[in-house]
Amino acid sequence: MSFSAIGDCQLISQLYQYKKHRVICSVKVLPTPVTHFERESKNDFHWMTADRWSRIECGLWRLFENLKQWQDAYQLDTELIIDHIIVRVQATNKSHPATVALLAGTESSSKDLCLDLQLQYITQEDTTIVDVIPAKRELATEAETNGTRPTSRKIRVANSGSKPKAGTQSKPKHIDADNEDDKSSTTASQPTKIKSERRSISQGGEKDKASSSSPSSSQQSNRIKRSHSPSQQNSRSSSVEAKPARRSGRSPIRPSRFKNFVVGETRSGKSRGPKPKVKRVSPVPAKDFKVEHMDGGRFNALQRLDSMLDTPKPREVKILLLEKMGEDEVLNTFENYRSDFDKLFKEREFKPRTSHYMNIAHMDVIDILSKSIHQQMLKKLGEVYSSRSNHTSLLVNGLLPLWIVRLFMDTYTLSQSEAVQQIRDQMKYNTYLRALNDEPLSSDLD
């Protein structure tokens, strides 16, 4: 189904045949406005597809099925939502002039149902989610202490002046030449570790041995390069203090899960002797019990099993069928039983489900007539009484068994109770014979 992409709307004329009624539809398809990026909005009719069109037609048929009387269709004025489509249905007195070409020369009558349908697709605007790129976090500054301004970590590291550059070696004073040569090679070979540069003074460590005790000597040592010990030269820390020894990853405290266990000690010696071999008792062959030797419990169980297997044989009856009646002969009897059909239909019209008629369901009478005659009988009943969807069980399990019971009564000259009892007995006896002869369940007319 193709539509042009221009115009304010698209008009479609359609002619349907619903049962015995002719339905003339004039469909108005509204476009969907589509707006592209930095462009003007345009009308789009491509949302209507063949699949959606078939769903709209199915929704129209369901609307007709839910009508109790066909006369209510001439007063339709409703709105449906089918597959994200708003369907406006309104009955009119006159059809659209464009539908005259669909009538093939015939004129529309007053019995024709004229409908105006308006289709509008429910659109939903897209929402664009823009991710916000967070800015880089600045280094946290230290809190002001004693009225001084907070200084960043970078400034403090720069002022310390004790951080050696990577790949270079410092020249400490008062160090032997041998130790200097050994440490210079190890310092150049070690890579730079950023983690050690951020180690704070609060971690502890020994004080620098090169610092003097007097204030004057400490001021002089600040002007010149400080001497580093071999342990300080190996350290990459930005602090003037020595790097403490790395603590082992294993805690010296024993975990609580080993509280009830003895770790590292030998178990109390218990002599484990060989396990005694268990002698297996060989099964004793079962003895043949006689009825006289059985106790009360076994005898009662045997009696219950025997009663379960003892199925009573149904009453033997002659199986009566209606195989001599033809299709036209059966359908012509519809008007004879019309009053009985109307009475049962009024009683069960608003019931949610019908399971049987006088304890006779559809499966009990399915073998009395052929399959083709069954289908024609259901079709005839559906044309007259099937105005609502919940009447299916009433037709199959109510009206159809009633019709066959009436045929049984007239053919074999039986009363209603005799005909019902005959159908029940012959169904039970036929099932018993097929089970006795190991034959599959099938119709006697096949």
From Swiss-Prot:
<keyword id="KW-0597">Phosphoprotein</keyword>
<feature type="modified residue" description="Phosphoserine">
    <location>
        <position position="212"/>
    </location>
</feature>
<feature type="modified residue" description="Phosphoserine">
    <location>
        <position position="202"/>
    </location>
</feature>
<feature type="modified residue" description="Phosphoserine">
    <location>
        <position position="251"/>
    </location>
</feature>
<feature type="region of interest" description="Disordered">
    <location>
        <begin position="141"/>
        <end position="282"/>
    </location>
</feature>
<feature type="compositionally biased region" description="Low complexity">
    <location>
        <begin position="229"/>
        <end position="239"/>
    </location>
</feature>
<feature type="modified residue" description="Phosphoserine">
    <location>
        <position position="307"/>
    </location>
</feature>
<feature type="compositionally biased region" description="Polar residues">
    <location>
        <begin position="159"/>
        <end position="170"/>
    </location>
</feature>
<feature type="modified residue" description="Phosphoserine">
    <location>
        <position position="282"/>
    </location>
</feature>
<feature type="compositionally biased region" description="Basic and acidic residues">
    <location>
        <begin position="194"/>
        <end position="210"/>
    </location>
</feature>
<protein>
    <recommendedName>
        <fullName>Uncharacterized protein CG4951</fullName>
    </recommendedName>
</protein>
<feature type="modified residue" description="Phosphoserine">
    <location>
        <position position="200"/>
    </location>
</feature>
<feature type="compositionally biased region" description="Low complexity">
    <location>
        <begin position="211"/>
        <end position="221"/>
    </location>
</feature>
<feature type="modified residue" description="Phosphoserine">
    <location>
        <position position="214"/>
    </location>
</feature>
<feature type="compositionally biased region" description="Basic residues">
    <location>
        <begin position="269"/>
        <end position="280"/>
    </location>
</feature>
